[in-house]
Swiss-Prot record:
ATP binds at residues 18, 60-65, 246, 311, 383. One of its GO terms (molecular function) is proteasome-activating activity. The gene is hslU. One of its GO terms (cellular component) is HslUV protease complex. Belongs to the ClpX chaperone family. HslU subfamily. InterPro entries: AAA+_ATPase, ATP-dep_Clp_protease_ClpX, ATPase_AAA_core, Clp_ATPase_C, HslU, P-loop_NTPase. This is ATP-dependent protease ATPase subunit HslU. It comes from Cereibacter sphaeroides (strain ATCC 17029 / ATH 2.4.9) (Rhodobacter sphaeroides). A double ring-shaped homohexamer of HslV is capped on each side by a ring-shaped HslU homohexamer. The assembly of the HslU/HslV complex is dependent on binding of ATP. Keywords: ATP-binding, Chaperone, Cytoplasm, Nucleotide-binding, Stress response. NCBIfam families: hslU, PRK05201.1. GO terms for biological process: protein unfolding; proteolysis involved in protein catabolic process. Signal peptide: none annotated. Its main location: cytoplasm.
């Protein structure tokens, strides 16, 4: 669980997302409240429930990006899902309880990886011994083993091919799992038979370098107690779990529509107990959802937040509106963020030994065209920059291998030459940009 302050969380999000101060502050406070709750006495801690968040804003303004960055900051079990993937209980498809099962699966993987780090030194020694045994033979004298150990540490054996017995992770009964409907709260058929066939090994040929990670993981897993991993992961999910539900507006049953709709209102009704607090059966044991934080987001182009079931609205008490991005925002996105598209294209072209320099007026021209096309065609926010940049670099990307050693300056004239006519013709930009 992260102990970053709200100011530090917002500062970290600012590196990748421009604007949207209110949304950043809301998720930062929600994340900090998880830490605050952990400091309380046990009896009071159980009474403090998370304040779930509803983020409302047009497409391409940073809703999903906030969730992706939050996942890395949280250091807690985190899952992002799309509401449109689920159907009402009783129909073919995934029901909403699988959200919690997926969250638990993610937590198990995360917990195991963290615990492997704790036993890394012991696992490395055991893995080293197995490699030396494969190279020198089981009956080798201590002096010979030490000689090979020295070579191994110096990397002299990296390309040596060895034969070792590794755990056979293939599951011959995998075909018995119904597609898309595995683990309905219990261990599925594939896993039952998988355990019956468990403990098998297969002899594989690989280089010493390739064997390193495989043997490290195997030896680390031998040192871990599966029950402790499971219990730790379940506790982390119940106390610190965060679920981000995207496209929540797509499951709104609009007031002007008639007739039954399997994946809309039914999904909302199924989400109610999950968000309010219920117990979900998973193959690792029951999970209580009372203290899991839910963040829902949607563009609400056609539906309105008021089209959500009133009970669901009540369970998402914190409302945050994200504003549409302007031309100035696009300039900042291209020049200030740590993962700016300009940096990405520079790095990509550098692999072909082509140097790229972006001038201020070049970046301004790119931002201006993106904003103009958003206004005249359809506002898809910052995603428009991907399309604009790809069109500007289309010719250069194709010719780059033949232009090795060249320096290219992307200024206003370069952008105009590659994109000007296209941007000015609204008919063309409708289909191309």
């Amino acid at each position: 669980m992260t102990d970053l302050t709200p100011r530090e969380i917002v500062s970290e999000l600012d590196r990748f997302i421009i604007g949207q101060k209110e949304a950043k502050r809301a998720v930062a406070v929600a994340l900090r409240n998880r830490w605050r709750r952990k400091q309380l006495a046990d009896d009071l801690r159980d009474e403090v429930y998370p304040k779930n968040i509803l983020m409302i804003g047009p497409t391409g303004v940073g809703k999903t990006e906030i969730s992706r960055r939050l996942a890395r900051l949280a250091k807690a079990p985190f899952l992002k899902v799309e509401a449109t993937k689920f159907t009402e209980v009783g129909y073919v498809g995934r029901d909403v309880d699988s959200i919690i099962r997926d969250l638990v699966d993610a937590a198990i993987v995360e917990t195991r990886a963290r615990m492997r780090e704790d036993v890394k030194a012991r696992a490395a020694k055991a893995a080293e011994d197995r490699v030396i045994e494969a190279v020198a033979g089981r009956d080798a004298r201590e002096q010979t083993r030490e000689m090979f150990r020295g070579k191994l540490k110096r990397g002299e054996l990296d390309n040596t091919v060895i034969e070792i017995d590794v755990a056979d992770t293939s599951n011959p009964m995998q075909m018995l799992d119904p597609t898309g409907q595995g683990q309905m709260g219990m261990m599925n058929l594939g896993e039952i038979f998988g355990k019956a066939f468990g403990g098998r090994t297969q002899r594989r040929k690989m280089t010493v370098a390739e064997s390193h990670d495989i043997l490290m993981n195997e030896e680390a897993d031998k040192l871990l107690d599966d029950e402790v991993v499971k219990a730790t992961a379940l506790e982390a999910v119940q106390q610190n779990g965060i679920v981000f539900i995207d496209e929540i507006d797509k499951v709104c049953a609009r007031s002007d529509m008639r007739g039954a709709d399997v994946s809309r209102e039914g999904v909302q009704r199924d989400l109610l107990p999950l968000i309010e607090g219920t117990t979900v059966s998973t193959k690792y044991g029951p999970v209580k959802t009372d203290h899991i934080l839910f963040i829902a987001s949607g563009a609400f182009h056609i539906a309105k937040p008021s089209d959500l079931l009133p009970e669901l609205q009540g369970r998402l008490p914190i409302r945050v509106e994200l504003r549409a991005l302007t031309e100035e925002d696009f300039v900042r996105i291209l020049s200030e963020t740590d993962n700016a598209l300009t940096l990405q294209y520079k790095a990509l072209m550098q692999t072909e030994k082509v140097g790229i320099t972006f001038t201020e007026d070049g970046i301004a021209a790119l931002a201006s065209i993106a904003a103009e096309v958003n206004r005249s065609v359809e506002n898809i926010g910052a995603r428009r920059l991907y399309t604009v940049m790809e069109r500007v670099f289309e010719e250069l990307s194709f010719q780059a291998p033949d232009r090795s050693g060249e320096e290219v300056t992307v200024d206003a004239a370069y952008v105009e030459k590659n994109l000007g006519e296209l941007a000015r013709s609204s008919d063309l930009s409708r289909y191309v940009l």
